């Protein structure tokens, strides 16, 4: 498996120099990095210096990277391919093109994509019911059934909108030899949901587009009864490009260091291809020693599964 990378989502917020940001990650023992969606343009000169001097390998970028001009607060959903406004979709495509071009320049293997939203808003309600001990109550199941019904209606107009945006981006990525990973999202209302993934992935060539698994996101959905984490990973394994690694406590406390949650990595790891990109994506609040401990734990899981 690819050497474990650390996402800059852990430390980009506290750095003004991109070289120093990447040097901090390298000094923690990580040979590679994912440039997260919080990378400001001011960090870019230092990032290029680190890349040119072989300080660290850049495995992947998370769209949008760098943060688009005009976006005040870094947000991977600042512009969405699903937005009903054509001008916003154009901004999403333009910012994504920039990410793909930068990934190609840096020799990154892939770019992580969020594809948008399709509603309905249901996750906060389900998590609230869960925390009140009403998981699988009548109110809980009725809310889920109605959400699924509405989502099937929404898919019919959301998916063509998203695909229209993705078509030129997939073409550009193919031309530049960069792969795109469509990420499993943490809430039902984001697109695509697990049942929608086959149609989305099948629309694009596997040599360009893959699936991006996120262990914490998949756990959150499993806790709310949307899917089986193991079964989803098993089904998507043939198209799996990479994964975000973090632990999660039910129902929604994710981006935790490994062993601080309930994700059974040992059971899931056999379904992760040996050549997959592996990225530790931890909360900025994670202490340095827990970042290092998570790296050691992941490497031990990989060794045990070999």
PLM regions: where:
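N-terminal small/glycine-rich loop or linker at the start of catalytic domains
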Residues: 1-9, 64-81, 119, 139-149
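Histidine-acidic metal/acid-base catalytic patches
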Residues: 2-26, 41, 46, 52-54, ...
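N-terminal substrate-binding region of glycoside hydrolase catalytic domains
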Residues: 24-43, 73, 78
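Short catalytic-loop micro-motif centered on adjacent basic/acidic residues
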Residues: 31-37, 181-183, 279-281
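Residue-level detector of anion-binding/catalytic polar loops
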Residues: 31-32, 57, 109, 179, ...
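Glycine-rich, proline-tolerant flexible connector loops at the mouths of alpha/beta enzymes
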Residues: 35-55, 115-122
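Short acidic, glycine/proline-enriched helix-loop-strand junctions
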Residues: 43-62, 128-141
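Active-site acidic/histidine proton-transfer and metal-coordination neighborhood
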Residues: 81-211
């Amino acid at each position: 498996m690819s050497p474990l990378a650390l996402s800059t989502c852990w430390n980009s917020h506290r750095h003004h120099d991109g070289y120093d940001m990447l040097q901090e990650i390298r000094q923690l023992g990580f040979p590679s990095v994912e440039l997260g969606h919080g990378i400001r343009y001011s960090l870019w000169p230092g990032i290029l210096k680190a890349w040119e001097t072989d300080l660290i390998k850049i495995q992947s970028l998370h769209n949008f990277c760098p943060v688009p001009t005009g976006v005040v607060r870094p947000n991977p959903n600042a512009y969405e391919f699903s937005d009903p406004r054509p001008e916003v979709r154009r901004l999403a495509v333009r910012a994504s093109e920039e990410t793909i071009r930068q990934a190609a320049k840096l020799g990154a293997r892939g770019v992580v994509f969020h594809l948008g939203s399709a509603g309905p808003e249901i996750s906060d309600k389900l998590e609230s019911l869960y925390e009140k001990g009403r998981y699988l109550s009548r109110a809980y199941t009725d809310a889920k059934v109605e959400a699924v019904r509405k989502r099937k209606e929404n898919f019919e107009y959301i998916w063509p909108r998203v695909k229209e945006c993705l078509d030129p981006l997939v073409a550009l990525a193919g031309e530049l030899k960069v792969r795109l990973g469509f990420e499993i999202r943490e809430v039902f209302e984001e697109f695509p949901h697990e049942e929608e993934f086959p149609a989305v992935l099948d629309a694009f060539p596997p040599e360009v587009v893959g699936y991006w698994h996120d262990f914490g996101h998949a756990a959150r959905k499993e806790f709310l009864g949307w899917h089986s984490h193991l079964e989803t990973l098993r089904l998507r394994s043939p198209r799996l490009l990479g994964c975000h690694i973090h632990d999660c406590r039910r129902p929604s406390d994710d981006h935790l260091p490994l062993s601080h949650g309930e994700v059974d990595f040992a059971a899931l790891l056999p379904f992760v291809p040996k050549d997959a990109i592996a990225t530790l994506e931890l909360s900025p609040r994670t202490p340095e020693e827990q970042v290092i401990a998570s790296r050691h734990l992941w490497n031990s899981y990989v060794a045990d599964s070999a």
